[in-house]
Design a protein with these regions (language model features):
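Short, structured patches in soluble enzyme cores that scaffold and shape functional sites
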Residues: 171-173, 183-184, 217, 237-241, ...
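Active-site-proximal, Lys/Arg-enriched surface segment
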Residues: 85-174
């Protein structure tokens, strides 16, 4: 799909998703606001698309004359980074999550998200994202860390930085990645805890739209596979190298020769493991791929790749090593 100007893209998105109308219907905790909620949310979404690193920089858009004209904002309606943060703090998270899921289903029906499947499956991936960072606290749920800054005189000092993190579940099949939903981490909370909460909330409604959920080495654990497989889907995670299954595949590599991939100088060992069968009510597969050819450094190709999955090994392309 090709797009022209951002104005055309915005017009198309409003036609398919009715964005402005739906954003304007979201609950606004303010009393008689002068700054429309739809303008705030459109600014926030545009900042996310541009991967703007902080709320201050996103909020600066509300002072940009051209951006305000695009939103139809008048000078007396105001708008600042601090005001943007205050409005976002008052959003109803349940409504926002529901709208994101509706957007995914609308994009699927409109043919924007196609079934150019990966591994023969319709895939979504889990990943940790940092939403905003700022030297000003926005809400009680902000996480905090320290950083070193340098002033105009070259003197260094330590300041507190406040930020939010969220685990996102994103559609990965086809040329357009799409965030289906996310879960914000509470202060002191780990990525896996938030991710499991996200999966438990979304997967029952995605059974007809997804086949496979992907994760990095953090997700190579019983709770991830139990949650995904329990929802009737398949899971795949990069091996952490610290499970009983790693010991089993290491022993297999010492005793059995690999299978060589036709047309590629890639060695593959694969096996079924019963290590977590009691908890998962099924076996997991372990696949270890090893590249036997030299690759240019600029390609950043892995020398080895080991994955753990509930998908039958014959479905996975052995050349991924």
């Amino acid at each position: 799909m090709a797009y022209g100007s951002m104005r055309q893209m915005r017009s198309y998105a409003d036609k398919v998703f009715e964005r402005d109308a739906r954003l304007s219907r979201m609950t606004d905790g303010r009393h008689d606001p002068t700054l429309p909620l739809s303008a705030v949310l459109s600014t926030w979404q545009w900042g996310l698309m541009r991967r703007t690193p902080s709320t201050e920089q996103i909020g600066d858009l509300l002072r940009d004359r051209r951006w305000r004209a695009r939103l139809g904002l008048k000078p007396e309606q105001g708008g600042s980074p601090d005001r943007l943060a205050q409005v976002l703090d008052g959003l109803a998270t349940v409504e926002w999550n529901e709208m994101m899921l509706e957007d995914f289903f609308l994009a699927r029906r409109a043919g924007i998200l196609t079934d150019e499947v990966l591994y023969g499956k319709r895939c979504a991936a889990l990943d940790l994202n940092e939403l905003f960072k700022s030297e000003k606290i926005h809400c009680p749920q902000c996480q905090v860390r320290e950083k070193t800054v340098q002033d105009e005189k070259g003197e260094k000092r330590i300041v507190k930085e406040y930020y939010h993190q969220a685990v996102a579940l994103s559609w990965m099949s086809g040329p357009i990645p799409f965030v289906i939903g996310w879960e914000v981490l509470a202060p002191g909370e780990g990525e896996l805890t938030a991710a499991l909460r996200l999966l438990e909330r979304l997967l029952p409604r995605l059974r007809r739209s997804l086949d496979l959920v992907l994760g990095d080495a953090l997700y190579c654990c019983r709770p991830f596979f139990k949650t995904v497989c329990g929802a009737g889907l398949e899971g795949l995670a990069i091996s952490s190298g610290q499970t009983e299954m790693d010991d089993e595949i290491d022993l297999l590599m010492k005793t059995d020769p690999p299978r060589m991939v036709p047309g590629f100088n890639v060695a593959v060992w694969e096996m079924e493991s019963e290590a977590w069968e009691r908890d998962l009510k099924g076996k997991l597969r372990v696949i270890h791929c090893e590249r036997r050819y030299e690759a240019p450094s600029w390609k950043h190709e892995r020398k080895q790749l080991r994955v753990v999955t509930s998908v039958p090994v014959e479905i996975l392309p052995a050349g991924q090593g």
